[in-house]
């Protein structure tokens, strides 16, 4: 499994609907980039200027909303993940 460093987290994106409410199938080019995901791994935390380590607020299993163009997409063992910094997380769902 991938292990993020520092204040980074790894998420699996929750894909958006392929149909509209009225039943129209959307092509890939018309879909918005997903902004929801499930946290699958978290780093050890960020280090402050004075050397203290601050634990992350998100934890494995959290569902989150993140900034639209945040993170780096990676593919590992056939699964696509997004690696982003905790500061790119806008909210924890639930």
Curated annotation (Swiss-Prot):
Keywords: Chaperone, Cytoplasm
InterPro entries referenced in this protein's UniProt entry, alphabetically: Chaperonin_GroES (IPR020818), Chaperonin_GroES_sf (IPR037124), Chaprnonin_Cpn10_CS (IPR018369), GroES-like_sf (IPR011032)
CC per GO annotation: cytoplasm
GO terms of biological process kind: chaperone cofactor-dependent protein refolding
CDD domains in UniProt: cpn10
Protein name per the record: Co-chaperonin GroES
Subunit: Heptamer of 7 subunits arranged in a ring. Interacts with the chaperonin GroEL.
GO molecular function: ATP binding; metal ion binding; protein folding chaperone; protein-folding chaperone binding; unfolded protein binding
Gene3D superfamilies the UniProt entry points to: GroES chaperonin
Family matches, as PANTHER family: 10 KDA HEAT SHOCK PROTEIN, CO-CHAPERONIN GROES
Keyword Protease: no
Localization per Swiss-Prot or TrEMBL: Cytoplasm
Organism: Shouchella clausii (strain KSM-K16)
Family in the record: Belongs to the GroES chaperonin family.
């Amino acid at each position: 499994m991938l292990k993020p460093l520092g204040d980074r987290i790894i998420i699996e994106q929750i894909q958006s609907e392929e149909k509209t409410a009225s039943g129209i199938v959307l092509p890939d080019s018309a879909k918005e980039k997903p902004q929801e995901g499930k946290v699958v791994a978290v780093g050890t935390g960020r280090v402050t200027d004075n050397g203290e380590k601050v634990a992350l607020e998100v934890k494995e299993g959290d569902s989150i909303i993140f900034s639209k163009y945040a993170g780096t997409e990676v593919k590992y063992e056939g699964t696509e993940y997004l690696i982003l910094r905790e500061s790119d997380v806008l909210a924890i769902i639930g």
